[in-house]
Amino acid sequence: MTAEPQDQGFPAFYSEAPTIKLRDPLAQFLGAARHGVIEYRYTDVVRLSGHSCPTVAGAYLMALHGLRALYGTEMPVRGDVEVFMRDAPGSGVTGVISSVAQLVTGAAGETGFPGAGQLALFARKNLLVFGADVDGVLGMRRRDTGKAVTVHFDNAVVPWPGEMRPLMTKAFADQANSAELERFAQLWQERVRSMLVEYADNPALVWVSDWQPAP
């Protein structure tokens, strides 16, 4: 029996976040998952990142909506999508976002899986690109059809409550007491909850546009 998120110390709302189900041909080929089907949950990206924040939640939702736009009612194919990050890997939170995108899509940079055998089957290497000419946070392109989209994100539509600003200032300066730190953490996760539960399908938070990348 699978433990619920709160049983592992996670906030209960993590289980309310949308899930992302894909088929991974490599997982099927190697017998890692029945029919290659893998379902990702928000808890997976929290484990990957080691934390939960608006950026991690936004990256998860961008991957979700990007794949929905590319595949429609089809099940997305992990490892068959290229991801194009607008900024350099060391710029701001680009590294955090790209890590989440890599987990979900399988697209990797130069350290990715080079492929199986002489035919390099199921290769994921160099499917993740930085510094791309993208009008959005990131772009995604199907390798089989060439269909491409850009994905945009604006977390300003889910603002911090007024109470948070002084708490954040004290917490980041390592000057908050235990009660203030507890409240800070509650408000921090409440914003994440709003994004994942109340705004998950709100096009003001995450929206997708068709894209025609340069050859």
Regions found by a protein language model. Give the residues of each.
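Non-transmembrane, aqueous-exposed alpha-helical and coiled segments at domain scale
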Residues: 1-52, 61-215
